[in-house]
């Protein structure tokens, strides 16, 4: 699924507020999946999730040139839950995430 969940909207609102406060701030947005589907599907899904997050932020008035969005599929798992490993739903959820990295932290004063 690549829609924005209500709990994710709260986090995206925080990002928007920070980007409004610091108009020169640029971010890289990286979306990740768990390992339960085929690698190619997960790559596509994470790309759609990244695009959805970026589009949501842009709809709030942030210039799209300030955001780079990229999907990583299941290439950067945060735990042992790779292909064929039996894990709980909570463990898989940890891998389904979007991370934000500030590209130019020097603009935050």
Place the predicted regions along the sequence by residue:
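Short, solvent-exposed loop/linker segments at the N-terminal edge
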Residues: 3-6
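Periplasmic OmpA-like peptidoglycan-binding domain that tethers envelope proteins to the cell wall
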Residues: 9, 30-109
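Extended extracellular/luminal ectodomain segments enriched in beta-structured repeat modules
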Residues: 22-26
């Amino acid at each position: 699924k690549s829609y924005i969940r209500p709990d994710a909207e709260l986090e995206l609102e925080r990002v928007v507020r920070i980007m409004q406060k610091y108009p020169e701030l640029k971010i890289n947005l990286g979306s990740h999946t768990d390992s339960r589907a085929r690698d190619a599907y997960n790559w596509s899904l994470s790309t759609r999730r990244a695009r959805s997050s970026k589009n949501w932020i842009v709809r709030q008035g942030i210039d799209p040139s300030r955001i780079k969005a990229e999907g990583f599929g299941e290439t950067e798992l945060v735990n042992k839950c790779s292909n064929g490993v039996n894990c709980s739903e909570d463990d898989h959820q940890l891998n389904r995430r979007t991370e934000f990295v500030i590209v130019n932290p020097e603009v935050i004063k």
